[in-house]
From Swiss-Prot:
InterPro entries associated with the record: CNH_dom, Kinase-like_dom_sf, Prot_kinase_dom, Protein_kinase_ATP_BS, Ser/Thr_kinase_AS, STE20_Ser-Thr_kinase
Similarity field: Belongs to the protein kinase superfamily. STE Ser/Thr protein kinase family. STE20 subfamily.
Gene name of the encoded protein: mig-15
Ranges annotated as biased composition (Low complexity): 380-393
Start and end residues of each CNH domain: 778-1070
Organism: Caenorhabditis elegans
Protein name according to UniProt: Serine/threonine-protein kinase mig-15
Role noted for this protein: Involved in cell migration and signal transduction. Important in several developmental processes including epidermal development, Q neuroblast migrations and muscle arm targeting. Required with ina-1/pat-3 to stabilize the commissural axons growth cone along a precise direction and are required for the cell to respond appropriately when signaling in the growth cone must change. During gonad morphogenesis, involved in distal tip cell (DTC) migration from the dorsal side of the hermaphrodite body to the midbody to allow for formation of gonad arms.
Listed CDD domains: STKc_myosinIII_N_like
Region (Disordered) location: 293-351, 380-492, 517-545, 574-664
Ranges of Acidic residues composition bias in the record: 316-328, 629-642
The keyword ATP-binding is assigned to this record: yes
Amino acid sequence: MSSSGLDEIDLNSLRDPAGIFELIEVVGNGTYGQVYKGRHVKTAQLAAIKIMNINEDEEDEIKLEINMLKKHSHHRNVATYYGAFIKKLPSSTGKHDQLWLVMEFCGSGSITDLVKNTKGGSLKEEWIAYICREILRGLYHLHQSKVIHRDIKGQNVLLTDSAEVKLVDFGVSAQLDKTVGRRNTFIGTPYWMAPEVIACDESPEATYDSRSDLWSLGITALEMAEGHPPLCDMHPMRALFLIPRNPPPKLKRNKKWTKKFETFIETVLVKDYHQRPYTGALLRHPFIKEQPHEQTIRHSIKEHIDRNRRVKKDDADYEYSGSEDDEPSPNNRGPSMGIRDDSESSSMIPMDNTLRKGFQKLQESSRGFAEPGAQQLRRLPQQPAPAPFQYQQSRYVEPRRESSEVKLRAVSSRGAADGPRHSPASRPRPVSHHQRSPQQSHPAAPHLADLANYEKRRRSEREERRERERQAHHAMPIARVSASVPAPQQSRKMSEPLLITHVKPEDLDVLASELSKMGGHHNGRSREESMSPPPPAPPPREASISSITDTIDVGELDNGADAEWDDLKDIMMNGEGTLRGPNKPLPPTPTDGENTLVSDVRRNGNGNSGHGAYKGKKIPEIRPGIISLDDDDSDSDNEEGNEPLMFKPINASSSRGALPDLLPKSPQLRRQINDQTRQMSDDRADESASLFGSFYQPNGFQNSDSRSSIQHSFSNRDREKSFVGYFGGGAGAGGGTVNRPGRPQDINQVQVNVTPNSNGTPAENDAPEIRKYKKKFSGEILCAALWGVNLLIGTDSGLMLLDRSGQGKVYPLISRRRFDQMTVLEGQNILATISGRKRRIRVYYLSWLRQKILRTEGAGSANTTEKRNGWVNVGDLQGAIHFKIVRYERIKFLVVGLESSIEIYAWAPKPYHKFMSFKSFGSLSHVPLIVDLTVEDNARLKVLYGSTGGFHAIDLDSAAVYDIYTPAQSGQTTTPHCIVVLPNSNGMQLLLCYDNEGVYVNTYGRMTKNVVLQWGEMPSSVAYISTGQIMGWGNKAIEIRSVDTGHLDGVFMHKKAQKLKFLCERNDKVFFSSAKGGGSCQIYFMTLNKPGLTNW
């Protein structure tokens, strides 16, 4: 279509659909938007309504689709176009308005649905002939108008209630240039795509014409005959590579097909499109022309559909709710359990050029528009003058996306003065996902209403509160929190903490967001202002402020980068007594560093402030009178300074502001609080003094700040649970030393504390710390993976989750199934595992696991997912030994080692949302015990694997298998531990660890360093850590070495021999477990305190 023709379509002149059409439910996804079942308000006639967000980048494409529908939808085999509307959204500047395309509704679904609902996944031959004929008639109409559909497939061929066939989705249609008559753009869905269309992406000179639709018709006929298109088990990018290179597909002989059907398939599936007939010629083919009476076929199809019509919600498998975003990089990932639903697109329009180019480059080295998350539509009761529909965002929406929360106007003098946001005279707008009704649809409405009435309760209880304050004046002091308010407001007193009990977890993110908006105008206040403690007040009744944070749903976290895991900020009381909150949903409370509590104590309100630090572990339960809010520094340990109501590592020299008086003022009462905190801390984690005796580093030295006084301040209990460390200057050459740079070296020993430090010393230990979770597991712990801040644990009898964000509770998730290995991909909403008796590669949806946790807590619906499968197997693999997920740019490869082969899968984004086969290598001479994948010079893929005979490589281009290192011991088997692809080596340099040694080689087997890494003893586990170090767990010690040089950075000496197993790591946090002894296992984690880690 010419640009002048597009200019004739003025989107802004279209009418608003309010009062004309109403939405009923989501029925599918088009190229540029979701498709809804709708109803004409006056006539009740059903219609299909495609809703698209308008933006400048795709405005021309949308106009093109409208033009195509207007001109070419007047045919019996093309869905009729009724009209277009513009939905004006609240507060919209026009950039985010919605376009509604209203079309004929086809109530019997797509051809793909028909195939799925047919026994055996194969339609009758006469049905296939009828459907192919109707498709050809529709295509003939389009081709006569010089239009190529370019996305013919089962999902884009719909059936009406009377079994009429209609073509839909003109989003990728193209009008041919009247002179050339050919296109050279790359678009369509991979498995149905014609070879000449794929060639256009590889060669600018390649072209195609309308006959590319006939290849797609042939693939659709195979889909109807066999249940799926050819190569559908392959990754779509792999299919794009193979379609032009493989011979044309044919009908399989497992079913008796007529000769004319076979010749029809052979006629349309000709690779050279110049030899392919045109549409008019195919309409005269015997398979198309010689058919039974049309009414007979339509009647039989209709009867079949009516007989097999099922309620999708009851019988559907668990729908994938993942993300098209990349997994955050290991050094920049936000520990998040948030899950986002992405709608499934039905085609791969210019799908991920970067991704496609990356695959193409990898496979040949030797020779869009982001749709919103899937939304569930919920009808609201009739309201005066609104549109009769509402969007409801999916349950698994990331907190940072919840920008359309209800605006709460508190019933107070301040709120009354502000006035309503919109005047009553303003024109009412239909309710949408940008504007919700708190009275009817908001899940946190009761809690928000409680906040709104809080001022009234405060006034009525003022006298009672004053009396209680006088009575409590002589009782034990309570740790109080004061808001940072201007001087005129400092005389106001904070009333009792807001009591919120039995809050549903799914409501808490919304509630936290509302609290933040109530207090948003205070966030810009300088943190350097001192905060004077208010007079004592009685303890809260049943709950405290902590009930907001302690019960927060650990699943509603963001999948983004570290910025989404900022500190817990500014929970305070304003002068009117209103509880105020952060500017984003509250994160889980524990710190991965496990947790340094810091307070800057202001003494009795005078100008002199004393600095005191309390170093300890997460307090598992907030007792009345103690307000404890922890900062999660799991991914960012470099933040220093004092912020209101945050406990975090702090530099002693930092004096950016003062903290409230969080600790009692008298020494005696402060000791009581410290003892109470210590006792509660022991309920979650114990220091491992019984297991680890000393920590050494070569050529030890002492920090410049004197630590000798620390030793004398320890209690006997503290001293017993400390260990000794030596800091070595020689380790600096290894590049992986734990020593902080710039400190003088000394041979004196220093005391390293792993216990709560109550005497005000800053928590800046250079040596690693080890903590032990008190929970004992009866089964053998085989693997673990971090999911957000929490830990998924696989044992020989099930899967469970250790809630590190709360009180250390363990949630059982799956029982009676062995889990040997696991990896979490939060961006894809999956947990990949080797599990079960047959050792399958099984992928679990994190959102499904999250629902199990919510049901355990009584917060989730009991019927939410019980009838859905929350997992899927990868291929038909059995007997998996080891797998590795490797990221290359935006591609995620899954490499699986089996008993005699190695399989490679790649993650396919929407609409597939699964790992799909990429390549396979069978009949290996060595059993792969560990596997890995490297990309040499950003171009060549190589599989690396270790066996009892050494280490080997497979070149993906040539499929050549060769040895890269074979240990010298003849006749002896080796135990491979790990393969490390060294950083900054273009995927060429390796560290291969086996037995008690490690060697440096390149991917071609040549030694690169005349160095052999030598462990002090045979390790049971070896792992590469993100700090640039490699760790070995032996029976007598844990060694930490530089991965670049193999130099020893430090070693933990055990007090008694014990076998340990590495589980997982993130940044400088390392988790490992003890072997099953005495009937139970325990989990330890180590914080390496790597210098400069925050810059990694």
